[in-house]
């Protein structure tokens, strides 16, 4: 029986609404509902066709434990875990295949041992930027409450911590302040350092539409001659690594000519 499952695309930060058509626990196709608020009924090629990995034979389907880990830690294992180790199945020269229950029990025991031996600061966790809010909440809760560790991080911090601080100081919030459809209400769009049609195609659709309809001017500044530049009112192809210099030049002119609101 074929049925639909609604979800959110995780390929980029746009967050398009998607619907997966599923039969016998396998995805047949992914599409956007015609009334989708974010997607507007359209998906990029990655959102629409990028799901083959779900059923890839290369995916690891069962719990695995390193043979070297068992050899190193077997003597210090609790008796109950030693007794259950006979359920391990040799997969190759490096790995055992284990039941999910045994794998989680071994992981819980080892984490508890590390915490009691080396203290709470011996543990840290790094989350992913493409996971759900619920899994992010669960990871930080596990780190702070179960492991009693303040060492929780996210892969997005490396590149977005500076922008978060800068945006918070400038506009009061380190995140987007407007919904995508506000693009249709704006008069001017400045794109710098973003290949929007490649990285965030569904947002680029709105920008192109607004530019074509002459409701907003579009200025594109990039070190590459990107596709979005074809739809721009003005395009500036910058020398490599000149983004910051260009922004400083704009700031200089604004200050010198008093083009800011006092």
PLM regions with names:
Residues 1-257:
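N-terminal export/assembly segments and adjacent metallocofactor-ligating motifs
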Residues 258-262:
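Internal, active-site/partner-interface "lid" segment
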